[in-house]
């Protein structure tokens, strides 16, 4: 299988959709200039609102979202595969979907994925999140054929549910994408170890573009976009600033890792009495 170059675009998005689109497009171009064939942006690419209600007010139905034509156009112009980590897509009067879009080099939407696991937590820092108040969770996992490998899609909080990734791996995925907006608190504690664990458990590459730094709405996200090898090695990492990081992805390394430690073959259903 052919080696390809993947990029994570790290953003510090605000509640200004058009400003965020421009910032994302600039970094997608930078990623392509670094040789990327596949570029991924983070969760909430075009909208980091102060709360779910504000995000709902600023969201669009898919057919009206100004980001999609812009991202489809740049994918075609640069001849890249582009994963738009997620957009807030209005699906009813009071709900959005947290939806990823995979766009092919002809500017066509190749796949969609709605984040399954919603972030409803109370953190020791006092931060409180109730994503389910304004977001409808998805119920379908997605695996897509790229020219180089099968890609398994996920978003942010999905990372804490290892069975999703095992199911994606069993469906043939050897590369996982995890576009995220981890909080500074949870990111510092868990980001690196969770991404490395998902890679090691499944012998898969993990491509995890992140939101990073202090946002205009007061929220602080962790940044540190990562690309992790199937052996759990960090092969590219961002800081907390907007940036693009790249790494070469050799799908043969996934097969080698799975041959060394064949846990996918050894995985068994267990009956608990």
Where do the PLM segments sit?
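Short beta-strand scaffold segments in enzyme catalytic cores
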Residues: 84-86, 99-102, 142-144, 225-227, ...
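CN hydrolase (nitrilase-like) catalytic-core segments centered on the catalytic cysteine
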Residues: 63-83, 150, 156-245
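Extreme N-terminal starter segment of soluble prokaryotic enzymes
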Residues: 1-7
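A conserved C-terminal secondary-structure "cap"
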Residues: 252-273
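Active-site catalytic loop in hydrolytic enzyme cores
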Residues: 91-171, 184-188, 193, 259-263
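Cys-nucleophile CN-hydrolase/nitrilase-fold catalytic domain and related Cys-dependent amidase chemistry
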Residues: 17, 25-106, 112, 183-201
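Residue-level structural signal for beta-strand termini and adjacent loop
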Residues: 54, 60, 114-115, 156-157, ...
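Short polar catalytic/cofactor-binding loops
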Residues: 10-15
């Amino acid at each position: 299988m052919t080696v390809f170059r993947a990029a994570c675009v790290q953003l510090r998005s605000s509640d200004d959709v058009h400003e965020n689109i421009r910032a994302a497009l600039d970094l997608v171009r930078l990623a392509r200039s670094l040789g990327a064939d596949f570029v991924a942006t983070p969760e909430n690419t075009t909208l980091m609102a102060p709360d779910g209600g504000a995000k709902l007010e600023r969201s669009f139905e898919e057919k009206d979202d100004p980001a999609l034509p812009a991202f489809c156009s740049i994918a075609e112009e640069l001849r890249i595969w582009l994963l738009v980590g997620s957009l807030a897509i209005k699906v009813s009067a009071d709900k959005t979907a947290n939806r990823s879009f995979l766009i092919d080099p002809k500017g066509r939407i190749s796949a969609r994925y709605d984040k399954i696991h919603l972030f409803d937590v109370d953190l020791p820092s006092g931060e409180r999140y109730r994503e389910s108040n304004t977001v409808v969770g998805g119920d379908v996992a997605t695996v897509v054929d790229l020219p180089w490998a099968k890609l398994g899609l996920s978003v942010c909080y999905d990372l804490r549910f290892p069975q999703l990734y095992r199911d994606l791996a069993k469906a043939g995925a050897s590369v996982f994408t995890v576009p995220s907006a981890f909080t500074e608190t949870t990111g510092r504690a868990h980001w690196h170890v969770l991404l490395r664990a998902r890679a090691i458990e499944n012998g898969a590459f993990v491509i995890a573009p992140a939101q990073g730094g202090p946002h205009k709405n007061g929220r602080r996200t962790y940044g540190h976009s990562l690309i992790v090898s199937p052996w759990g090695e960090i092969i590219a990492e961002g800081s907390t600033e907007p940036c693009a990081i790249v790494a070469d992805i050799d799908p043969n390394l996934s097969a080698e890792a799975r041959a060394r430690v064949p846990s996918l073959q050894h995985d068994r259903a267990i009956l608990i009495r």
